[in-house]
Amino acid sequence: MTETESLLENLKRRRVPQIAGMYIAATWLVIELGDWVTERFSLPGDLTSYVFIAMLVMLPAVLLVAYNHGAPGRDRWTRTEKVFVPINAAVTVALIWFMTPLIDVEAATETLTIQDETGALQEFEVARRGYHRELVSFFWENETGDAELDWLSYGLPIMLMHDINRVSPVITAGTPFESELVQERLREQGYDQFTGVPRGLAVELARERRSDVLVVGNFSLDGRQKVVSVSVIDATSGDVIETHTGSAGDWMAAADAVTTKVLGIWEITPTENQSDDPISEHFSSSLEAVEHYVLGQVAIKLRGNYPEGISEFDEALTIDPAFAEARSLLSVMQFLNGDIDAARASATLAMRNSYRLSTSSEFILKANRYIYDGDYERGERVLEIWSNVQPRSTQALQSMAQIAQIRGTPESLDKSIAAYDRLLELRPNYHTIYRL
């Protein structure tokens, strides 16, 4: 290097600007790729924030290495590099460690503003990308020795599902009754009643439908005490995350205790405008009404007996007229049975107690009320909003795709195709889609 060589020429000769530019471009590429990966595999969205901080803080070390080794020819590592690069890396790790609480603050949910079917703007609290948890509870084993309590094999998981789904958008729960894929697989394996499923098969099915965790359990009696024992299992590894055995004076309280245990795993608390009220306050105050509601679902899901199902729902509502979930489902069965006026009346009554419904049930009821009146455009819009609020809900996507397909407009058909495509991303093995 001559004495007249400028600093800029020296940096160019050592290729510092070129290497710095490539590093910045690589940083941008990694962040873009990271955003795609977190969205595709439902990973925490703040992972790219950590990557950005790490690559930004490591820039001084990159510039130093570029200055010493960028020029043509062979170079040796200097003492400065051997000291500075590890220190820079340590500072990066420390900075990420101290900034983690700042990055994680209120990261689980965000507010989404959407124009509803009437044109008004509505705010919805939704799970941030990568923070949503999906749970499937398989039906539990009756160890009471009393066959009259067999309905609780279905009833307890159903109560658990509705209880969890009211608490926070961060977690949604379901049972085999909500998954055609699981029902199809269970029948193929010979479990026509959807009970007695081996743990290994349950894990396989939960993994196949890309749930995060599954719940298996049993229930028994200890004198007058109602006892439930459940295991919460990681669907990916098959490892047990948490176990719970507890007793209560009634079956609803026993299911409430399981909800508390499940929510505690991820420290999930009720979000604004939602609560973890006792099941008896939001589902039904009568266990007898719940029994008829469950038996109605069993009649329809297992035997395809719609008249029996409707009769059971009617019985449940005779006992508890405020049972919103039962009345909403009754309206659907009446509609499918061709009794449009009865379906419309049931949906209207259910809407008076809509505060007792889970988020998904509320969307379904609202959309159905429009559909019963022949207003498919607004019904489609409600389901589209639901698919935006719960983007991992296969039920929302399938409902959206089907009604858009029924409307048949070019725009609706595009929405239907997009919904089916998204459904296949979430459930690649859901072959039934190809027959829709």
Predicted regions and their residues:
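Structural signature of tandem alpha-helical TPR/SEL1-like repeats
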Residues: 305-311, 337-349, 373-381, 406-422
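C-terminal/domain-edge helix-coil "capping" segments
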Residues: 70, 95-130, 199-201, 224-225, ...
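TPR alpha-solenoid repeat register
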Residues: 326, 360, 396, 432-433
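Residue at a conserved register position within TPR or TPR-like alpha-solenoid repeats
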Residues: 299-300, 334, 370, 404-407
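Membrane-embedded alpha-helical segments of integral membrane proteins
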Residues: 16-79
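Short beta-strand->alpha-helix linker/helix-N-cap micro-motif
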Residues: 114-229, 234-243, 277-282
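Canonical tetratricopeptide repeat
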Residues: 329, 399, 435-436
